[in-house]
Amino acid sequence: MTLSNPAIAAASGVILAGAYLIDPSALPFVAAGVAATWARVLFKKTAVKTPPMDPKEYRKFKLVDKVHCSPNTAMYKFALPHEDDLLNLPIGQHISIMANINGKDISRSYTPTSSSDDVGHFVLCIKSYPQGNISKMFSELSIGDSINARGPKGQFSYTPNMCRAIGMIAGGTGLTPMLQIIRAIVKNPEDKTQVNFIFANVTEEDIILKAELDLLSQKHPQFKVYYVLNNAPEGWTGGVGFVNADMIKEHMPAPAADIKVLLCGPPPMVSAMSKITQDLGYDKVNAVSKLPDQVFKF
């Protein structure tokens, strides 16, 4: 075994020399013990830790906390296998949740709202529907219950300064992949990407993580958020109704080779936004979005 670390080599030399002076016949056994000890030390330093989540195999993750943020939406916190584990999910990618419901294996994709470098856990924001499958299953979870998850997966992976500007249009929990990207951009002083976000909801109470979004827009001039409500309260200063062409023209970057528009939300909304953006001169949205696409739907 070659000892490349000078301190390790020196310590080993002292041990071997001492053994020789006390009992020369024991030298081979002491040398073997020294070699085995340092082999274990070096192995611990170089061993690669197994990722807590696998892209192909579903694994179980225990629910440790549940916080409601609107009447039908909650944040679900799941523990990773070890306290020092990191999910290390690429920015813009998601995980798959699978459950057996009425004898059928059903899966849905979700993007964690927690950061990929949060230690020991990940958080999912889920809106539950009475007729939903996976979303209803989440609403029935109790602390200590487990889910089956695998990942990462997805065609989008954000890298700093990948384009000059990003326009985002999301509805409800479609916020989650956008939030990942927004956080990554504003916390990196070298990332100069401009971000404009149109966030649509039914009522003001439905706006998920509004306090964080408002704070980010106040602290970081490169990020702007525009809220749209179907049912707006009196005195509301944001958009009212459905996201339309005029809102997109005012709040999104104009079509150009160095911009992207990201869409995420209920299927009818994404379909409507795909048509409006194409009518405004953006590229046509492909059935399955790929990273190079100008308009990408999650």
Curated annotation (Swiss-Prot):
CDD domains named in the record: cyt_b5_reduct_like (cd06183)
Domain FAD-binding FR-type: 56-159
Protein localization: Mitochondrion outer membrane
GO BP: protein histidyl modification to diphthamide; tRNA wobble base 5-methoxycarbonylmethyl-2-thiouridinylation
Alphabetized GO MF terms: cytochrome-b5 reductase activity, acting on NAD(P)H; NADH dehydrogenase activity; transferase activity
Superkingdom in the source lineage: Eukaryota
Cofactor(s) for this UniProt protein: FAD
Pfam (any one): FAD_binding_6
Family, per entry: Belongs to the flavoprotein pyridine nucleotide cytochrome reductase family.
Protein name: NADH-cytochrome b5 reductase 1
Species: Mortierella alpina
UniProt gene name: CBR1
